[in-house]
Regions:
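Gly/Pro- and small hydrophobic-enriched strand-loop and loop-to-helix capping segments
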Residues: 222-240
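Conserved alpha/beta-domain cores
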Residues: 1-212, 218-220, 232
């Protein structure tokens, strides 16, 4: 059972985040309503997620398939969309397709083909983003900026996939200036992708920015920011969702 103190903390945190989001948007002449707040709820319990769903959070993001399944089965998002934002193993695609409103982390032709087959079998259209490894880190998932274009072409040609945009996580060790430059590079990549005018795509989503850098992500064009600890507090990895 969550305490009143925990509930108040979450409400105050979300209000503070919303204020910062709006300020960053206005600095660059953007409408704050055009930027969505994704609560990254990895390791958070069903109870925590349900409690946060009444707050001005637009959607929820899951890194682990088991947590997406448990929370969607429990209706923890209370009617708000759930996105899959973590590395997706091909053997778990069937559990995610149709559950996640948007899979943000498609990063290979093999994974793309698995998503297409699962969506076809379920007779639905799955929306996706392509994840870019913008910092070229060997330890991270994501396609390189150079390899993006053939993957985009392939994604746009799939009958049961709708391509919506790009996602990225800059290197954690990057300085604020370096991080903002990575965000600017993502904005430019999305603009170039949109200029390809795919028929079966709407390149309007740029998912980037987390608890430590989301204002700069918004200044550089993010349409979704993914925020976890700044909403819920420090993660306890011993807890099971």
């Amino acid at each position: 059972m969550l305490t009143q103190e925990q509930l108040t903390m979450m409400a105050e945190n979300v209000a503070r985040i919303r204020e910062k989001m709006a300020a960053a948007a206005r600095e660059t002449g953007r409408d704050p309503a055009d930027i969505l707040l994704c609560a990254a709820c990895k390791t958070r319990t069903v109870e925590e997620v349900i409690a946060s769903a009444v707050l001005p959070i637009d959607l929820f993001g899951e890194n682990h398939v088991q947590e997406l399944v448990e929370k969607t089965d429990a209706n923890a998002y209370c009617g708000k969309p759930g996105h899959f934002i973590g590395h997706l193993q091909t053997n778990k695609v069937n559990k995610v397709v149709g559950r996640a409103a948007l899979i943000e982390s498609v990063d290979s032709e093999h994974l793309l083909q698995k998503v297409e087959r699962a969506a076809a079998a379920a007779n639905l259209t799955q929306e996706i983003l392509i994840e870019i490894n913008i910092g070229g880190e060997e330890s991270k998932s994501g396609v390189s900026a150079e390899s993006l274009w053939p993957l985009l072409d392939m994604a746009a040609a799939q009958p049961h996939i709708r391509l919506r945009g790009l996602m990225a996580i800059p290197p954690a060790a990057a300085t604020p200036d370096e991080t903002r430059a990575f965000f600017a590079q993502m904005r430019e990549l999305l603009a170039k992708a949109a200029d390809r005018h795919y028929e079966n795509a709407k390149m309007d989503i740029l998912s980037m920015g987390m608890s430590g850098d989301y204002p700069d992500a918004i200044r550089e064009g993010a349409t979704i920011v993914r925020i976890g600890t700044a909403i819920y507090g420090a993660r306890d990895y011993s807890k099971k969702a």
